[in-house]
């Protein structure tokens, strides 16, 4: 029987280096970006929290991987492979528990989903306080707080999966996978043709402006 692992990355962010403003690939490729922690919790009792370079990625091979918002964590993993940040492995599946709980009628966020499912309040103040802080500049107390926060997120991700996975239809799973794959692949664009047509459009716009009889005159 294959093992299921919940996985969660913790990354540097600030007002400029932010996925909210840059999108996934813009964020991951930002010069200030740093994926300094990964937490992994398995349904076999396995736990890891630390730098991604210290994690044994091979244990994910032929296993199911879960992330709460896999469009972030899986996409970061795939991007990191292209940058040689960590090893390439082949999980059996990578499921998004955020998509799962939404399909099951729960709020999408981990905080609100666990509040409704388990009447459990979890604080996101640690994540808020991580803004603008690099791992190497955090004091030891805050480092431990971040580690505990990361592990808790993975534990709750796994718990939601164990309780709601049977209620998640195959149809909704397929939609989740296809949407995420489409985002990761992006849109195919012929950039040379785009630039050529943009220049042609600018030239045509200039010609049209020159044909306006009162063009270039000051308004009365």
Predicted regions and their residues:
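Short, polar/flexible loop-turn hinges at active-site or ligand-entry regions and domain interfaces
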Residues: 47, 82-90, 101-103, 119-125, ...
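Catalytic-loop motifs flanking and including active-site residues across diverse enzymes
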Residues: 73, 110, 153-156
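Conserved "right-hand" nucleotidyltransferase catalytic core of DNA-directed polymerases
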Residues: 1-17, 22-23, 30-39, 115-118, ...
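Short alpha-helix plus adjacent loop in nuclease-associated cores
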Residues: 92-120, 126-136, 146
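Conserved RNase H-like, two-metal-ion catalytic cores of nucleic-acid enzymes
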Residues: 1-108
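Surface-exposed charge patches
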Residues: 75, 112, 180
